[in-house]
Amino acid sequence: MTILFLTMVISYFSCMKAAPMKEASVRGHGSLAYPGLRTHGTLESLTGPNAGSRGLTSLADTFEHVIEELLDEDQDIQPSEENKDADLYTSRVMLSSQVPLEPPLLFLLEEYKNYLDAANMSMRVRRHSDPARRGELSVCDSTSEWVTAAEKKTAVDMSGATVTVLEKVPVPKGQLKQYFYETKCNPKGYTKEGCRGIDKRHWNSQCRTTQSYVRALTMDNKKRVGWRFIRIDTSCVCTLTIKRGR
């Protein structure tokens, strides 16, 4: 498990080191930048001859530092008032020459953290905390998969404008495809008629797909290409309304 985790971390940061890192504005009027990368310092310090090695060393000193950097990443950009119910996620976008075989690294890091927490429990406590043993089920059935920009074609950005999602991103040695890890309600699941575990005598329930913002390379209606935050499907939640007349 530890060896697999180490391999994923090294591969992930190798991709970050190979990807272009230039200044980019949120609304897409800047230059090309790697999505989801948290930059430190000035632009000159990022584009110097040793910028990639410095960033790689500072982030990969220990497993704990890597987890802290990715799980506690802070976003200062806020959605507009119209889209204030949406969150910001940058880990659901990946640049790759082929369809990714695993969920985003941040998801795997969370699973690894849970694995470490479970390792510190006694066998009895571990069995008791296992959701499968307690009979726990999700309120709404969902499905997750990687989709390409060719499947999305268009999306809504943070200003509410419809933009074109570009299928390929230029990199120094060619082009990579943009992949988005989307989560939505499962139309073939057992909760398509309502949320699981809800008292239907008193409540109307519905499983609904919600969206969050991720950073992607897009083009607006004025043919301006840049990195913008767009909305994609990221979760399936239960919505409730009380039944009247009871």
UniProtKB/Swiss-Prot annotation:
Top-rank taxon: Eukaryota
Residues annotated as signal peptide: 1-18
Pfam families found in the cross-reference section: NGF
Keyword Cell cycle part of the UniProt annotation: no
GO BP, sorted A to Z: cell surface receptor protein tyrosine kinase signaling pathway; modulation of chemical synaptic transmission; negative regulation of neuron apoptotic process; nerve development; nerve growth factor signaling pathway; neuron projection morphogenesis; response to heat
Compartments where found: Secreted
Propeptide: 19-127
One cellular component (GO) term of this entry: perinuclear region of cytoplasm
Keywords: Cleavage on pair of basic residues, Disulfide bond, Glycoprotein, Growth factor, Secreted, Signal
Residues modified by glycosylation: N120
The keyword Glycoprotein is assigned to this record: yes
Gene Ontology MF term list: growth factor activity; nerve growth factor receptor binding
Main localization of the protein described in the UniProt heading: secreted
S-S bridge residues: C140-C207, C185-C236, C195-C238
PROSITE patterns: NGF_1, NGF_2
Family per similarity comment: Belongs to the NGF-beta family.
Function as written in the Swiss-Prot or TrEMBL entry: Important signaling molecule that activates signaling cascades downstream of NTRK2. During development, promotes the survival and differentiation of selected neuronal populations of the peripheral and central nervous systems. Participates in axonal growth, pathfinding and in the modulation of dendritic growth and morphology. Major regulator of synaptic transmission and plasticity at adult synapses in many regions of the CNS.
PANTHER family registered for this protein in UniProt: BRAIN-DERIVED NEUROTROPHIC FACTOR (PTHR11589:SF3), NERVE GROWTH FACTOR NGF -RELATED (PTHR11589)
Protein name: Neurotrophic factor BDNF precursor form
Species this chain originates from: Gallus gallus (Chicken)
